[in-house]
């Protein structure tokens, strides 16, 4: 058995397979249009986008792939192969939202927010595929962006990057009930291959920092813990509220910690906060500093420094922000002891999903084998579920022809 799972790429072979499945389930004979929407991870910038902080982001070679055709009316239909392996189907029109949260909520909400943004007359018949759903890679942002891109295409609506980010945010905030910021959407919308994006979440803009020459000798690896996540059932919203409470104690006019004036962010004032709120503020302000240092390290090709900042970030997420799950904390601790791992941190909110590692390219196979041996030794029930994959860089969400 290999230590690194088969790598995924949006190759023509993968697309052809999904197109064939889409035609079979819909009964259509014509070729569909296709949206490829990659997933993302953030090596630095955890839990601070909703606090006005900048974020370092990178798209990764896991995907939402949406095959679609214009429908015959304003109604849309959607088919999905869910985790249990069974096909599910639904049909809906604009504003047809169900009271209960369902697998198709994000598609229904995407139709609704786009109709609020611009005049729409055309629905789609679509089939959606996801390579790693609910693994802390922002598959939700990825699939929402895919829906919006397809719906805009069939209605001849031009969406700029900022439009995609804002409409996707509305789906997450207004319909999924998450109080998250926009780093997930921005990470994908502004994604660029062979680079890291420095995201300014307040300005909704990005600066791309090209991979340094030193990355020729390094790789990003990702390890799926075997335990999926769902932010709507996590402590995500509570943490956002705690950060807001800390901000208002530091500066009454602040809605989040990023709005607290710099002169009021000193050690003494933060230390005077209630312990829990002080730790939340320490994480946010420390992570803001690490993002700046990380951007400089990436530009300078200082891989060791960048990796150490990832370690510090993950440590703060665990101890100051208190977001790590049992399995991800175990992976983090194991990875820190493996030679050739420059740094690691878990992805997403840390409530389940994946760990990302920056590693020595020549030691990739050995690192993967050692990590899995130790991890499965602790959690034998996850054998055959947990896996290590190469995390190659990807670009932005895009429309392609089959």
Across the structure, where does each feature detected by a protein language model lie?
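C-terminal nucleotide
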Residues: 1-40, 44, 69-102, 195-343, ...
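FabD-like malonyl-/acyl-CoA
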Residues: 141-144, 354-358
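Structural signature of FAD isoalloxazine-binding scaffolds in flavoprotein oxidoreductases
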Residues: 54-73
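Short, flexible active-site loop motifs that bind/organize anionic cofactors or intermediates
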Residues: 134, 154, 296, 318, ...
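Glycine-rich phosphate-binding loop
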Residues: 351
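Gly/Ser-rich oxyanion-binding loop with an adjacent helix/lid
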Residues: 1-33, 42-54, 89, 99-215, ...
């Amino acid at each position: 058995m290999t230590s690194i799972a088969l790598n995924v790429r949006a190759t023509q072979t993968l697309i052809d397979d999904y197109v064939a499945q889409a035609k079979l389930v819909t009964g259509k004979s014509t070729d569909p249009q296709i949206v490829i929407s990659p997933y993302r991870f953030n090596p630095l910038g955890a839990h601070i986008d909703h606090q006005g902080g900048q974020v370092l982001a990178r798209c990764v070679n896991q995907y939402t792939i949406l095959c679609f055709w214009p429908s015959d009316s304003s109604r849309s239909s959607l088919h999905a192969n869910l985790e249990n392996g069974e096909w599910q189907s639904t049909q809906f029109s604009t504003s047809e939202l169900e009271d209960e949260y369902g697998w198709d909520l994000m598609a229904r909400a995407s139709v609704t927010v786009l109709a609020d943004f611009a005049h729409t007359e055309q629905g789609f018949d679509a089939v959606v595929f996801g390579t790693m759903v609910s693994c802390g890679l922002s598959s939700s942002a990825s699939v929402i962006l895919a829906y919006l891109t397809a719906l805009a295409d069939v209605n001849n609506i031009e969406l700029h990057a900022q439009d995609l980010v804002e409409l996707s945010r509305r789906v997450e905030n207004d319909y999924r009930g998450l109080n998250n910021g926009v780093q997930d959407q921005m990470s994908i919308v502004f994604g660029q291959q062979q680079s890291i994006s420095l995201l300014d979440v307040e300005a909704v803009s990005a600066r791309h920092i090209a991979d340094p020459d030193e990355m020729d000798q390094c790789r990003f690896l990702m390890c799926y813990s075997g335990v999926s996540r769902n932010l709507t059932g996590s402590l995500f919203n509570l943490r956002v509220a705690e950060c807001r409470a800390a901000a208002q104690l530091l500066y009454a006019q602040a809605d989040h910690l990023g709005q607290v004036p710099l002169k009021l962010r000193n050690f003494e004032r933060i230390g005077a906060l209630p312990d829990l709120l002080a730790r939340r503020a320490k994480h946010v302000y420390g992570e803001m500093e690490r993002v700046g240092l990380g951007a400089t390290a990436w530009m300078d090709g200082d891989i060791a420094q960048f990796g150490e900042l990832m370690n510090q970030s993950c440590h703060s997420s665990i101890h100051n922000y208190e977001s790590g799950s049992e399995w991800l904390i175990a992976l983090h601790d194991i990875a820190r002891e493996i030679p050739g791992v420059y740094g690691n941190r878990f992805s997403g909110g840390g409530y389940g999903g994946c760990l990302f590692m920056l590693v020595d390219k020549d030691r990739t196979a050995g690192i993967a084998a050692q990590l899995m041996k130790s991890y499965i030794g602790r959690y034998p029930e996850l054998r055959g579920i947990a896996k290590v994959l190469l995390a190659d860089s990807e670009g932005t969400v895009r429309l392609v022809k089959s």
